[in-house]
């Protein structure tokens, strides 16, 4: 499982255990 950084979701905070995988995929570093 790739480490996704939801900056846009958390306002610059990295959250890898965010329930929204779909939104994570957008900010996923692959």
Curated annotation (Swiss-Prot):
It comes from Treponema pallidum (strain Nichols). This is Uncharacterized protein TP_0932.
